[in-house]
Amino acid sequence: MTPPLIELEGIRRSYRSGDVVTHALRGVGLSIHAGEFVAIIGASGSGKSTLMNIIGLMDRPSDGAYRFGGRDVATLNRDELAALRRGCFGFIFQNYHLIPTVSALGNVEMPAIHAGAPRAYRHRRATALLTRLGLANRITNRPSQLSGGQQQRVSIARALMNGGAVILADEPTGALDSKSGTEVLGILKKLAGDGHTVILITHDSKVAAAAERIIRIEDGLIVSDSGPDPEKVSSSIAVVPWQASDSSPPLWTWLEEAARSAFAALAINPVRTALTLSGIVIGVASVVAMMAIGRGAQASYIERASAIGTNWIVVDRAGESTGNSLPLTPADAQAIKDMDNVSGSMPAMWDMATMRRGNIDLNTDVVATTAEFRTVHNWDMAKGTFFTKQDEVSGGPVVLLGATLASKLFPGIADPSGSNILINNLPFLVTGVLESKGLSERGTDRDKRAVMPLRTATMRLFGKDDLSEIVVSIADMSRLHETKEAIKALLIRRHGREDFYIYDSASAFQKAEDERRSSNLLLSAIAAISMLVGGIGIMNIMLITVSERTREIGVRTAIGARTADILGQFLTEAVVLAAIGGVVGLLLGAVIGVGAALLFGMTVIFSVTMALGALMGAVVMGTVFGFMPAYRAARLKPIEALARG
């Protein structure tokens, strides 16, 4: 006689609710051999379902011993029990317990997915099982598109996917019409005939009559047992003791299937998914667009500032000259030029004037200066010639035009040199056009100005010789601070007081950089808060998802999903959700950046590193905030999950 496949000795199961203890099983002893077709019959509350759950390793007894294939299952941990369920048991439930978002083929494949079987094998075997059960033309249908009988056949195919050495059928005909019920019982009889151990749980004596052995249970005790078929017990069916396996699906297969399931689950409620994504999308888009615009602004600032050199100091008057202050004068500029480490000193007077040519009138800046203008600002001519030393001395009526100003006064004329214009109704000769320098660091157009000799402006236009500023070029920028202090001391000696102020290109750059950093910090904080809100949204939606899919968790666990499988499944969904939000955020950020460039003429510079960092931040956010819901799902016991679902 072969040893029993299933041995139960003194099995008890009690449940406590407050101070009330309910005894579902009161010392059940039972042996079932491989290949038997057994029906366990009892009324509602008799303990038959509790007994099935213990036999199927979905629940543990409060007391007693259970051996499967000769091994005490009490020694197995949670994942070892899952492996045993996955490899040896197949479950057929009264309410089918099919996953509604997955096709018939996908439902049948699921046990093999958790076993790590290759996709081609899974597809081939699941198709063969469904075809064998008469569902060849329903493979791609979802459960909602199948009748009750068809859904139960899908459930049977799922139970057989990993072999199904032991088939546990819990009221398999309870939700079916008589014809479908008869068909299901016929399938179970055939499975028993093929060598499967079939355990049928029912309250109906007519259904139980289909089995070869009938066990009756009442009030948690077995009250009758027709006994096993002696021929089956003494048959040559050998029971190979089962060994727990710690093997798991290959990582890539596991990730692929988890991601596939995640996308399917998220597609169920696209509106809710989109709303959950919004926080992550806004956060990532803010980071990408902000950094692109910020980097572009910084590059533009440096480019604009570099157009006229970056090795300068500006000495500016402290306000209008009064009795208590002295104006800046050309003599001050000359004194500065004679100092050590000064390569050029440009006196400058700024004022507005009206330019006229024909019927074209323009109000623009006039810069009155010396030939030092070219040296200090590194500004060459595009057309014509710079004014001469003789022009400076005589104050001749000559003027140079910026590129923008020239194009407005002389539209369609490439070189206006030699032409005459009126400035404040006085005639001036245009001797040349300056090369284009673009916008200043303050955003004003450097090319929309006129330049003339200092003496010319003093004598003919402005009637004053007070300088607006003195621009000083520095030979050695490493001695910038030393030179600034020397200029300051010189002017205090000349003026008798500090009635001026000095700033330099480095300070201007630093100020602009500080402002940019402050702005970026503020926007980064806003983006971080947005992503934090998005992460909390992911956690909330995943908690809701776990609650809504409790039955699915129970089904997956019943068919052999490990704790890591469930944890990974829901954690992957959270990460996929965050990653989708991150990718959409990247695209939106790129659109915002490009839109800013096209609509406002802004320079934008995208950073691959920053974009990847923002995307990784979103993924990390999904991982962190998705862990708690995933962990909660992974800790659900199969029997509890099925009952709550």
Swiss-Prot record:
Which membrane topology term applies here? Answer: Multi-pass membrane protein
Which branch of life, at top level?
Bacteria
Q: Name one GO cellular component term.
A: plasma membrane
Task: From the Swiss-Prot or TrEMBL record, state where the protein is found.
Answer: Cell inner membrane
Q: Which InterPro entries match?
A: AAA+_ATPase (IPR003593), ABC3_permease_C (IPR003838), ABC_transporter-like_ATP-bd (IPR003439), ABC_transporter-like_CS (IPR017871), MacB-like_ATP-bd (IPR017911), MacB_PCD (IPR025857), Macrolide_Exporter_MacB (IPR050250), P-loop_NTPase (IPR027417)
The protein's GO terms of the molecular function aspect are: ATP binding; ATP hydrolysis activity; transmembrane transporter activity
What is the protein's quaternary organization?
Homodimer.
Family assignment? Belongs to the ABC transporter superfamily. Macrolide exporter (TC 3.A.1.122) family.
PANTHER family attached here?
MACROLIDE EXPORT ATP-BINDING_PERMEASE PROTEIN MACB (PTHR30572:SF14), MEMBRANE COMPONENT OF TRANSPORTER-RELATED (PTHR30572)
The record's function comment reads: Non-canonical ABC transporter that contains transmembrane domains (TMD), which form a pore in the inner membrane, and an ATP-binding domain (NBD), which is responsible for energy generation. Confers resistance against macrolides.
Name under which the protein is recorded: Macrolide export ATP-binding/permease protein MacB
The gene behind this protein is macB
